[in-house]
């Protein structure tokens, strides 16, 4: 059986990530070459030996001294090796990568942290991270939604709804002329778009739900929450006013741990019955659950 669309997306992204970033732990430093070998020194050489060897090789391969193109390429490698080994921090990281080549991700992170960490603006890094995460989040949401829609469209209930809507639109008359198959297919697509598909757990993707957008709107959200809470305290704690229908519904829904969309799908009579029970009060809620347990046992 083929994996679901969402899993295939995730697998493809993981493989792409691995293909881009996973490589030899030491290759990120001097490529396929050994940094010490490029400078002609041993791994335990001191800083003076490394510096002396670099200047000696510079006299032979520097572009100003040697115009040969191959020598120019070699000098670039030598200069790179010297930049890595002259600094105690990067040299220690390189030595660790040699000793622990299996720790690919750690060694790679250490390298780029040392190379770019001090040059990067934390704000730019944060923005970039939010953009990347939001992009992945949106792609995942779209994949999940399309997969859920495709699943629903294969159910008998959906097909019956579509057939009923088609009969209503055409008056029960089918087109048997040439090309009717294409016309019927187009009509089905139009009717399918008219059907309101409410799929729990796979709502239509919205930019307002993205992590980056929520982060940008965080100050507004906090202010809005503080205003709402202050109004609640003033109205119901200080003035002791009776709960409005909306607020009583909110308290009831929160007491029963019912999601907003599930509450919206309840009929008005059921909502009114639950609100009148004042389930936000502990004793009333306990009595309600006790009644539900008794009712469940009775039905068995």
From Swiss-Prot:
InterPro entries linked: DnaJ_domain, DnaJ_domain_CS, DNAJC25-like, J_dom_sf
PANTHER family, A to Z: DNAJ HOMOLOG SUBFAMILY C MEMBER 25
Cytoplasmic side stretches: 144-206
Pfam families attached to this UniProt entry: DnaJ
GO biological process, one term: protein folding
One cellular component (GO) term of this entry: endoplasmic reticulum membrane
Sequence intervals crossing the membrane: 123-143, 207-227
Glycosylation sites: 46, 88
Topology within the bilayer: Multi-pass membrane protein
Keywords: Chaperone, Endoplasmic reticulum, Glycoprotein, Membrane, Signal, Transmembrane, Transmembrane helix
Tissue specificity of this protein: Expressed in leaves, flower buds and flowers.
Record's subcellular location: Endoplasmic reticulum membrane
Signal peptide: 1-27
Domain J per the UniProt entry, residue ranges: 34-98
SUPFAM superfamilies: Chaperone J-domain (SSF46565)
Function: May play a role in protein folding in the endoplasmic reticulum.
Transmembrane among keywords: yes
Protein name per Swiss-Prot or TrEMBL: Chaperone protein dnaJ 50
Upregulating conditions: Not induced by tunicamycin.
Disulphide-bonded residues: none
